[in-house]
Amino acid sequence: MNKRSLLFVSLIGIAFVGCQIFFGYNDFRSCRTLTEKQKTITEQVLAATKSMGLSVSPWTTSLEEETNKNHYAVRVGDKLLLLNQGGSASSVYSSGVRWNFIEETTACDNIHVALYGEANETTTPSNMGKVFLPVTNEDLPVLVVEFRNNQEPVVFLGQYKQEQGKVYNKDSAVYGTSLVFWRSGNEYLPLGIYNSKEERLESLDLPITKAAVFSDSKSANAGANSAQYFVLSNEYMQLIVSQESGSIEGINLPFSSEDNKSIVNEIGFDRELKAQVPSEASFPGLPSVGANNQPVSDTVGGYYPLLRRGILSDAKKRTPSSYHALNIVSGRELTNSVASGYRVSTFNSTMLELESNDGSIKKTYKLPQQQPYAFEVEVGVNRASDDLWITSGIPEVEIMSNAFTPAIKYHVIKKNKGQLDKVKLPKAKDPLALRSGVYPQWILNSNGYFGIILSPLTDIPAGYAASYVPGSSVPTRLSLLSPKNQAYPASKYPGYETLLPLPQKEGTHRFLVYAGPLADPTLRVLDKAYTNSKGESPQYLDCITFRGFFAFITEPFAALLFIIMKFFRMITGSWGISIILLTVFLKLLLYPLNAWSIRSMRRMQKLSPYIQEIQQKYKKEPKRAQMEVMALYKTNKVNPITGCLPLLIQLPFLIVMFDLLKSSFLLRGASFIPGWIDNLTAPDVLFSWTTPVWFLGNEFHLLPILLGIVMFAQQKISASKKKGPATDQQRQQETMGTMMALLFTFMFYNFPSGLNIYWFSSMLLGLIQQWFTNKILDSKHLKNEISVNKKKQR
């Protein structure tokens, strides 16, 4: 090799070594810079988390030993978490404090995570229950404590990708085994341990590390890990609480059975929905867990959904969380949820406590066992605001006498007396109605037979709000029935929501919520339970008001008739029979008046030939003929309108019964003849078909047909006793009778079966009474004498 070649090789070697030294030094500087940066970040993060009870410190097995810089522990509140290779010591020392061993669990790569508590603790911490992470497609912010061999742990804020189960750090990769924490309010909760080799976050089975990890298949509660809803239930109701909104997505009332104390009966809509769309008649209907942290299995049927749930099978058509019950909202339209994403801190059979991820809202639902269809909610607000409202939720649709009858009312104290005022329902053009200057004792959002009463137990500002929600935004379950025929289009049934304001300061606000039937037995119990020491009752019974144009007149009488019906129901055990017995009772009560009317009609029939003579005699003098006829009526004590009297007598009772059936929840779902008359507040159904027919719909109702036949027969029996040719007036009466029979048949075709039973029974008893009275009068000729020109005539 010549000198030139040797010089070239030497220069290349020197350049290579120089490059190695240069890049090595740069790597060293970069590594050192990164280490310093990580140390700075660690110090900054720990400084910020110290006030929240999270810190990192070395630990040793005795106070005499020199602090081992290779062993570090994470302090979370009054607990200590440390990693080891197993065989945890019974006690350790950290920050000059003795910590006693509580429990240990095996994590990834045979690494053990041990839990220690302060030495002065005398009890072992109980399992605090699952803490469910908010379900979101976005990365979840977490705090990571990364343990590296023979180095002080690195602490940084990272991101947790729920779908992949990975933890990310924007500055560098996560190399070492790490403990991951999730901030909830003003504290950090242990979320799990991150396996950097498999890039997977795994949960830890320790009392204070019960946060759910959705991608962890090894979790003891894997079924609960995907839960989005929590079920709190008793014998009266099933509450479905949303993890996203922290509010109530569903209030399901069980049908009456031997296993519960509910008074809600199954009706035709429930059976049809279960048969046509069973997935939409399932309860809870959404992935849920109970107080035991186990998934709650769906059941098809068995419940009445008091709140609109939307279309469960279509996530886009479910009821938006802003319309959930007991949601905290704000904004111009009062539809913006204040907080989104909640964790559970306490969950047992009677109480569910949640806190929003940002710590601004805390809710506690308490479900008493003895108060029917009632529960309490405590709302803790940790930030002052002048625009916070609590919602009632939107009741499901009830069809009453073939009509949709929502109502909003509020109860106030005026002149030391309770008063129930009705709220005019808002319209689509002006969907939000705000009222100030009023202090409601409670506010009712009703669909007819059911209602949601929101009653503040602590002081709140004056005012209330009522909101109109388009039916397409919160579709009713009825829209799923016969969708091809558009029997119950969602747009036809808008929703209505009530709201109460919250105080403009931090604090805890309590509310009593009644969510159930507007029935005397349950509301009376609630009134008694919440009567104060002064004997002042909240007067929830005022919710039961009679509906109708003449309710202000019929209400006292309807209340009296219902008392009589309840007496007959107590004797017979059947509401249908009690309606018939009530009809018999009223017929006996009015027997003298009806008998007088029938006798008067018989006298009219006897006078018919003489009236014809007068009309023929004074054919050219109609006024004289009219005067003579009236004199004849007066002489024989006959009134021409007595023929209409039996029907006129019955009309007030008919109106009262109509109002009674629309206002008495106990008759809803009450069966009389199974398979035919299954609900006294709905039309009877002898049979049905698929394609609707004009007027008849897709159901055949027999009771109105029978009613028309009886009315026609009564008119015929009345006409059969007339002698001689019929007068014009009599022919008009016969025509009117036939028309009335047809009119009542058509008018009553879609009326409640209970009303048809009453009217049919009344007409049938009237027919029997008329036949019986005619027989008696025929056997007593002297009683049928008439006078013409002051002479006795037969």
Curated annotation (Swiss-Prot):
Main localization of the protein described in the UniProt heading: membrane
Q: Which GO terms describe its biological process?
A: protein insertion into membrane; protein transport
Which residues form the lipid moiety-binding region (S-diacylglycerol cysteine)?
19
Sections of the chain in a coiled coil: none
Q: Which InterPro entries match?
A: Membr_insert_YidC, YidC/ALB3/OXA1/COX18, YidC/Oxa/ALB_C, YidC_ALB_C
Q: Name one GO cellular component term.
A: plasma membrane
| Assembly, per entry | Interacts with the Sec translocase complex via SecD. Specifically interacts with transmembrane segments of nascent integral membrane proteins during membrane integration.
UniProt name for this protein: Membrane protein insertase YidC
This chain's source organism reads Chlamydia caviae (strain ATCC VR-813 / DSM 19441 / 03DC25 / GPIC)
Question: Which gene produces this protein?
Answer: yidC
